[in-house]
Amino acid sequence: MYAIEITVQGTVASDVETKVTESGRSLSKFRLAANERVQDRQTGEWKDLPTTWLSVTCWGRLADHVTQSLVKGTPVVVQGRLRERRYDREVSGVSVPGSSLDLTARVVGPDLNKGVAQFRRTKSPAVRRAEERALAEAGFASAAAQPFVPDSS
């Protein structure tokens, strides 16, 4: 089976659910509503086409950053691997086939066509540890390791 890589503009349509797997890896999920607008050439009116719904899954640092950055209603651009998941569900005692579009995200960002954002770079745990080691070797303790002592003057 070949992977389908896509880029989708849409709106976060659910709260972001966050979990940590048994192996300690972060996982976040949210629903994405993608709406396409087209202009009627004869009337000039804009019309919304039916909404395409996707379930988006993010892993690792991306999952951590999505959890900290996105809320329901945020316009986003998501790039990743698309798969159709088929399932059966019971409706009034009858098994009914269904399907879902699942997108495993590689990149998620704000849709700057819809607003502005301010980017804040994060440091990886390895970089933070290296900086703390360098400070310790230079005779400085990290601020987190130093107890707070109020000024007595």
Report the location of each language-model feature.
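Core FKBP-type peptidyl-prolyl cis-trans isomerase
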Residues: 2, 6-51, 91, 95, ...
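OB-fold and OB-like beta-barrel modules that bind single-stranded nucleic acids
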Residues: 8-13, 32, 72-84, 105
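Well-ordered beta-strand positions in beta-sheet-rich domains
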Residues: 29, 51-55, 86, 100-102, ...
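Generic beta-structure capping elements
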Residues: 32-37, 81, 106-108, 120-122
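A beta-strand/beta-hairpin structural motif
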Residues: 42-68
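Beta-rich strand-turn-strand
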Residues: 59-91
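OB-fold/S1-family single-stranded nucleic acid-binding modules
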Residues: 83, 89-115
